[in-house]
Amino acid sequence: MNEVTCSITGDNPIHKINNGLGLKWNNLGKFSDFQTNDSAARDARTIDYIFTNCQTGSSIGKIDFRAALPADKSQHSGVSEKEFSRLENQWSKEFSCFPKNKNADVTKPSRNKHEKRSANLHNRYFAQYYSTAYQQNRIYPCRISYNEHSSVSNGWEFQFKSIENQLLNELKIENNVEEKTVGYEYVAEYEETIDFMHMLSSVPQTYQFLKSNIYITERDPYKIGCVLMDNGSNLNEVVMAFEAAISQDPSHINAWLKLGIVNFENESESNGELALRNCLNLDPNNTIALENLAIHHINQQNESESLKLFHKWILSKFSKVFQPSAGENKDSINKIPKKAHLAHILESLLNMGIEKKDQYDIYSVLSILYYSDQKIKQSQKCLEFLLLEKPNNGTIWNRYGAILANTKSYHSAINAYNKCKQLRPNFTRVRYNLAIAYMNKGDYVKASKMLIEVILLRSKGYEHNKAKMQNKFMQNLKNALIASKNFDSLDLINGSHNTESLISTLKAIYNKMD
């Protein structure tokens, strides 16, 4: 709203009073834009070197890893960077390290700064300015000091009243105005979906097996699961195979281990944690389970538990080097270590000339410890070393994309995620990370497509009802559709009354997208 000035000629005393009041109506209804200058500093030469050297013997084409430039304001469709910075890219749930809102899995769209607001929104903020009391005591407080029969007021009251009416007319919005293009009717739905946690049951204390399992009668379902995993089959089928193996032999350590890892990769956090805990109950020093469970706790912002697990991982993996002294009790071993102390131990191990395989494991853990300690460059160097040594490891590409995304280098992060997706097409987690990166970049159409892929991948082979499908993926899909103003697709999703129709609707929406 433009600043309103009162033009009164002569040396009228009311003119002086009015000027003294300094009416600044432009402060009413003015909103600030949040702007964040993305840090896009990337070492292009290092990245190009990685991509150049990692292609040897690989059929996958070279990806141009360029430094991410700050996205143009027009590409954001009005969604502020500050809103989406709360979003857990989740470290692809591989490692999100800084404390954040635990509900940040759901991304919040915002309004364009030039969008018109509906009459209800206007009345909420400006209704107070219509009241007579406000007009007398706020707009022109000097009126209460003048009697109606004052000789001063009789001369200018008419002109004063006309200016006041003009001012109120500028504030006034007709009640019958409809702003259908903005889509505020969907904001209420967004407010319902943003807090989806109430729809989720409490975390179970025991692993939740599928009720129906096609592999339960097979002779060796564990072997079937390993073959499915190696061949890049749908992760739901891999989960069923390992669950069948455990049903036949509850003490199968490797089945529990692989089941936990696959559940994490399929974005089933609670079952993944429970499976790995069962593995550790059977084999307390299983280093693979310790590492993956430690990473999971970092994702859950439980840093103290993750540090305990990393400490135990070091003692278990390098037991010949670190042998507890006779006076060292269990309490001292379980004491929470400092990140810097653990990193120093691992750095010392690297200088001892250990085996190559152990070096890879140390660099993997160091990359996580460095990042959680906000040492971004050191973390990147660890991952870059691993990529040079293992260019076809999809998990490392996923983690590398995650660290780039958390430094807001979204273009480079998307390239890394796509590399991982090429190597592991069944990796549900990397598709979800891609969706989050696209949303942070402001590309809501691609984000919507990737979220639909995630939902369809996770629904394959499972018996779902519609209520169970209202998870964080569906909520983020709805928010992406709202942000892109694709309200027709949102209506189609809301109009699906059962799982079959919902899946068919999602496929139809996906095929219509550019």
From Swiss-Prot:
Short sequence motif named WxxxF motif, residue ranges: 91-95
Subcellular location as annotated: Cytoplasm; Peroxisome membrane
Induction of its expression: Expression is induced by oleate.
Example GO molecular function: peroxisome matrix targeting signal-1 binding
Pfam families: TPR_8 (PF13181)
Xref: InterPro entries: PEX5/PEX5L, TPR-like_helical_dom_sf, TPR_rpt
Membrane topology annotation: Peripheral membrane protein
Mutant phenotype after disruption: Leads to a clear mislocalization of both MLS1 and MLS2 to the cytosol.
Alphabetized UniProt keyword annotations: Cytoplasm, Membrane, Peroxisome, Repeat, TPR repeat
Gene Ontology biological process terms from the UniProt entry: protein import into peroxisome matrix; protein import into peroxisome matrix, docking
TPR repeats: 174-207, 218-252, 254-286, 288-320, 326-359, 360-393, 394-427, 429-461
Cellular-component GO terms for this entry: cytosol; peroxisomal membrane; peroxisome
Function description: Peroxisomal import receptor that mediates the peroxisomal import of both malate synthases MLS1 and MLS2 in oleate-grown cells. Recognizes the C-terminal peroxisomal targeting signal PTS1 sequence SKL of MLS1 and MLS2, probably via its TPR domains. Interacts with the PTS1-receptor docking protein PEX14 but not with peroxins PEX1, PEX3 through to PEX8, PEX10, PEX11, PEX12, PEX13, PEX15, PEX17, PEX18, PEX19 and PEX21.
Domain comment in the entry: The WxxxF motif is involved in the interaction with the PTS1-receptor docking protein PEX14. The TPR repeats are involved in the interaction with the C-terminal peroxisomal targeting signal PTS1 of MLS1 and MLS2.
Family: Belongs to the peroxisomal targeting signal receptor family.
Quaternary structure and interacting proteins, as annotated: Interacts the PTS1-receptor docking protein PEX14. Interacts with malate synthases MLSL1 and MLS2. Interacts with TLG1.
Listed name of the protein: Peroxisomal targeting signal receptor 9
